Amino acid sequence: VYKRQILEREQPEGAGSFFQKLMKNDFGIEGTLSSINLKEDLKNLVQEIIPNQLSSTEFYNYWLADMETVCRTFLLIEKTDTLCFWLGTKRECRRYHVDNVPRRLLVTYAGQGTEWIQNQDADRLAYEAGEPNEKIVRDKSKLNFIDKWNIAIFTGGSNGILHRTPDSALNGPSILMKLDHPEYLNSVYSSEVLKLN
């Protein structure tokens, strides 16, 4: 019931030095991407945070192509023509939680990947009661971390995988790409409008 899929990949050569330079300044970008203009829209969005000395490198084009491929894969999985895209260095999910979405795709390109636990290693009642992480995790030796460049798709909702931002990413920079179905953005916007009224 508590589903997750993780596709393991090797970190390509040149990634470490490229992202080390990119992470010198914090950033966060988001937008809606469509299958029709995906390559162009993605490039325009990412250009906002890429220094000139990095945008001319071969690895930059490799990274853009990788993000495009992952985005197109998620569009097929979700059977939709658009998706919500987020890319940033700041991750602030300290407490274990589940995402309020059917599925979410995560790729950590630099830094430590998302921390997660199997359901049998978690106290779901403690989680539902709002207890701290120490009460939610039954055994710290059972913690899992998504490796850099691996593609993770987590089921959300009440049967979602419990996960959080690891301490290393809370206290230092990393680069995470997050993809959601466009209905997620609509639901968040609707809830914000309701709060204002």
At which residue positions do the language-model features occur?
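Short beta-strand micro-motifs in enzyme catalytic cores
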Residues: 5, 104, 173-177
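Short, small-residue-biased leader/transition segments that mark boundaries at the very start
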Residues: 1-2
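Catalytic core of Fe(II)/2-oxoglutarate
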Residues: 136-197
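Catalytic core of non-heme Fe(II) oxygenases with the double-stranded beta-helix
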Residues: 90-148
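Gly/serine-rich nucleotide phosphate-binding loop at the start of the catalytic core
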Residues: 8, 12
